[in-house]
Amino acid sequence: MDKMQSTRNKLIELLADNTDQYISGQMLSEKLKISRSAIWKHMKELEKDGYVIEGKSKKGYRIISFPDKISENTLKWGLHTKWLGKTIIHKETIDSTQFVAHQAARDGAKHGTIVIADEQTKGKGRMSRSFYSPSNEGIWLSIILRPQLQPYLAAQLTLLTATVLAEVIKNETLLQPQIKWPNDILIHDKKVTGILTEMQAEQDSIEYVVIGMGINVNQTKDSFPEDIREKASSLKIESGQDWDIKNLIQHILLYFEDAYADYMEHGFPNVKKKWEEYGFKIGELIGIKTLQKEWDSTFLGIAEDGALLAEDPYGKETKLYSAEIEWFKERK
């Protein structure tokens, strides 16, 4: 970041922390160690970017509102986390937030750094599937974590993330999301969110984890490609209204920080309980296909380690860590 942008970010931070009062040009000049005329020029540039700033003679400046578009500064204003999102890498257009997050993590990015984009051109889902990520219509976000966990536990972070997103969607939109094991969130049987967890690890320790999430927020049905139009949905389609993307991101980060702290202190039981509150098709018939066999079974929930719990072909409870699931089965 160049010196001018750094100064501008500090200026926004000062204004954002004092929205209920004016800050004199003299005070800003002293804190930022630049002239009052330079302060005035920065204010004019911020107004060009969409910031609404009120300036009054003998009183100073105060910020009235931030631009609608997402940026590092707009996200930090009103974000009340302790460590998550304190470093933000924001891009207007990007191939994938996962790619950038991996590179940032390899370069030493801190625990809690987030990568966010207005648009992804190569959005990444599970099993190398693509994830449709249009400009300014959704949340395309990756979180870098450096947890003190055994590598085999990293998959539990996917389930934790799913509970966080389900809680945010329910509490902020009043919609009724369900979590489809292991990583999708559905509303009325249509996908609104996908989660991808990747890591770099040694045999017994994790170097870093990158949790990526794509959330369809303000798309209309016609904005989806035809091949996914009947399977995908958005918060707007399901609720009939637009949603403030910045506000949703801030809630996600706040909820995630709390849930992650609880998980690191108490382990998986609270995640399991919350996950099963939102679990899709629990108690219902599903089709299961593994490399060895396929059968119909009742979905029982998730195990203490996050595995899918179902009945094997002989009616005995079994754990599945990887399987092809047919979710829409009908009992005969």
Model-predicted regions and their roles:
Residues 39, 97, 141, 184, ...:
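Residue-level signal for inorganic ion chemistry
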Residues 2-163, 167, 243:
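N-terminal lobe of the biotin/lipoate ligase/transferase fold
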Residues 2-34, 48-49, 159-177, 187-332:
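Long, positively charged amphipathic alpha-helical accessory segments at protein N-termini or as interdomain linkers
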Residues 62, 185-187:
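Short, active-site-adjacent cap segments at secondary-structure transitions
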Residues 179-183:
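Alpha/beta catalytic cores of group-transfer enzymes, especially the acyltransferase/condensing modules
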Residues 87-88, 112-114, 139, 178, ...:
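Structural motif
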